A protein has these predicted regions:
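Short, solvent-exposed alpha-helical "recognition" segments
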Residues: 34, 67-78
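General nucleic-acid-binding
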Residues: 1-14
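Short, amphipathic alpha-helical "recognition" segments used to contact nucleic acids or chromatin
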Residues: 34-50
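Helix-turn-helix DNA-binding elements, focusing on the entry/boundary residues of the two helices
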Residues: 11, 51-53
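Short, Lys/Arg-enriched N-terminal segment that forms or immediately precedes the first helix
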Residues: 16-31
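DNA-binding alpha-helical recognition surfaces that contact promoter or target DNA
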Residues: 44, 57, 68
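Short alpha-helical "recognition helix" segments of helix-turn-helix
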Residues: 53-59
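Residue-level detection of the helix-turn-helix DNA-binding "recognition helix"
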Residues: 47, 60, 71-75
């Protein structure tokens, strides 16, 4: 299993826990609940030491979107 496949499997576990799919996490839809779960996936990848650019590649998002998500999480967690 490649590192990307391992990360997608972990993203899938988080997504499934909330009733979503990996495709939902990698897609462009922005339902409030989906965005919150996507941010949890981003936080998990960041905790594993990935850069914002690497997370962007994994999540099919621009790195600036990843930076914004991490800033929102930091603000929420004080």
């Amino acid at each position: 299993m490649t590192p990307r496949e391992k990360n997608l499997a972990e993203i899938g576990k988080i997504a499934y826990k909330y009733g979503f799919t990996v495709e939902d996490m990698l897609g462009a839809r922005r339902f409030k609940k989906m965005v919150a779960v996507r941010r949890e996936c981003i936080a998990m990848l960041r905790a594993k030491g990935y850069s914002t650019t690497e997370i962007g590649r994994i999540m099919n998002k621009d790195h600036s979107t990843i930076v914004t998500s991490l800033q929102v999480l930091a603000a929420q967690n004080g």
